[in-house]
């Protein structure tokens, strides 16, 4: 039996009470070996030394200039570190990690054997309890039950990522028998929660603070040296960063195009306002957009360049930006 994934693209308000998301474009880089923690500590923004079997870290992997290859959620599974992230950002990050990994006792690879599904909504915790007898939460966000890893993500709608081999994930999905949506709906939730989504096209362009990593505990300023650390510290303590990640809303008459541009009004003219990282357009035309814009004052009047009559508004994120 195969998983039947709905092709519908509901708005946030139209999602059912409890549902699944097939994370078909989600994956993980695995690091294992005697020096896995020591090596990773020198490569990423979070404090790898603080990871345990039951906690979760957010972090970024940067180049020497502090530009971000990937943003990930770090967990431990079967004595290995897993960097959970969209598959679109894995290749570039993996290449760079392997480049320096040859000098350490560490094995670095894509966790190809794993499958991922997300359980979300009002009854999600009850279903997790029923199926696994233990529920991760804000205090213990990672739980290991046999071969299954359960990861809790807080938010207006708590999310649970279920990780196991692909056959087991399929079996769990069939047993739960809930409405199941595509990865696009996951992107909707990530955008509204202010969690940055990077692809091959946007990897290597932004420092962590432009992606709001400092606001979601994705940067340790006390851990010591890592690749790109000087740039990240300079941005934080010298107030060099003037851009931030925003969640924008619009109601569009036409489909949003991958090459669309956000414009700002300057008098009678319009100019590019910033960069679009990701978007989600529901079947009813409502659209949420993840964009990097100037953060040095009130947002100007915005529009989608290809749809001149569009109105773009700012949606408040569930966190505040730490003062630079």
UniProtKB/Swiss-Prot annotation:
It is found in: Cytoplasm. It holds the Pfam family YgfZ_barrel. It comes from the Bacteria. InterPro entries: GCV_T_N, GcvT/YgfZ_C, tRNA-modifying_YgfZ, YgfZ/GcvT, YgfZ/GcvT_CS, YgfZ_barrel. Belongs to the tRNA-modifying YgfZ family. HAMAP family: tRNA_modifying_YgfZ. Folate-binding protein involved in regulating the level of ATP-DnaA and in the modification of some tRNAs. It is probably a key factor in regulatory networks that act via tRNA modification, such as initiation of chromosomal replication. This is tRNA-modifying protein YgfZ. It comes from Colwellia psychrerythraea (strain 34H / ATCC BAA-681).
């Amino acid at each position: 039996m195969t998983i039947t994934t709905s092709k519908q693209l509901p708005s946030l308000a139209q999602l059912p009470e409890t549902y699944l998301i097939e994370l078909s474009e989600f994956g993980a880089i695995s690091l294992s070996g005697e020096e896995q923690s020591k090596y990773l500590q020198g490569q990423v923004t979070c404090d790898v030394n603080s990871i345990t079997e039951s906690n979760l870290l957010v972090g970024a992997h940067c180049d020497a200039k502090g530009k971000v290859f990937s943003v990930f959620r770090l967990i431990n599974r079967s004595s290995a570190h897993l960097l959970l992230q969209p598959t679109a950002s894995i290749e570039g990050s993996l290449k760079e990690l392997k480049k320096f990994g040859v000098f350490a006792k560490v094995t670095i690879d894509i966790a190809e054997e794993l499958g991922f599904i997300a359980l979300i909504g009002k009854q999600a915790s009850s279903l997790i309890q029923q199926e696994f007898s233990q529920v991760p939460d804000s205090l213990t966000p990672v739980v290991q039950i046999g071969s299954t890893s359960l990861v809790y993500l807080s938010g207006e709608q708590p999310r649970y990522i279920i990780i196991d081999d692909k056959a087991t994930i399929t079996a769990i999905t069939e047993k739960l028998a809930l409405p199941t949506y595509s990865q696009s709906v996951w992107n909707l939730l990530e955008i509204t929660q202010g969690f940055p989504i990077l692809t091959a096209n946007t990897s290597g362009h932004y420092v962590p603070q432009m992606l709001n990593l400092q606001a979601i505990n994705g940067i340790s300023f006390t851990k010591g040296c890592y690749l790109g650390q000087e740039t990240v510290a300079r941005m934080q303590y010298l107030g060099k960063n003037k851009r931030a990640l925003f969640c924008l809303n619009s109601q569009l008459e036409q489909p949003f195009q991958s090459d669309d541009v956000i414009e700002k009004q300057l008098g009678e003219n319009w100019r590019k306002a910033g960069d679009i990282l990701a978007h989600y357009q529901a079947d009813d035309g409502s659209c949420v957009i993840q964009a990097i814009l100037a953060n040095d004052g009130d947002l100007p009047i915005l529009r989608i360049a290809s749809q001149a009559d569009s109105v773009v508004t700012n949606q408040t994120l569930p966190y505040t930006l730490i003062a630079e």
